[in-house]
Amino acid sequence: MINELSLKEKRVLFAKLAGIAYRDVKDARHAAKLLGFTKTVLIDIEGAQTYVFTSKTDCAIACRGTEPSEMNDIYADLEIFKADSVSGNKIHQGFKEEVDKVYDEVEKLLDRVAINKDIWACGHSLGGAMATILAQRLEYKDGHDVDTLLIAT
């Protein structure tokens, strides 16, 4: 499904998914279904939220970005110290810690639902940073092939 789209169509799709990541589960499920995704799972742990949308051919991970009313998100944005990534590079500690919260559940879910499917990651703002780190970790640590299209402002 997604691989058949043009780059412009992919950008539009992932911008929509990044926006859907801010919705509640019921609204997100409905919106994702209109885009061709048949299953929607929200992973929400200690203020870090990530949706996994699944279709017949794809799994799209959409990480929720900064919500100004959520102190957890503000704290994550402001925690600018450097941390080690799985590839040996230095990354933003607050963003890494948000991924740490959801990573195990995302990885377990992908092991069940992403067999023979393309995996994509996207997000806006804090969610864009999370998508980048999550995709890197899934590839380096677990051998998943993840395509990443970030929607960031």
Description of each model-found segment:
Residues 1-122, 126-153:
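Non-catalytic, mobile gating and regulatory segments of ester bond hydrolases
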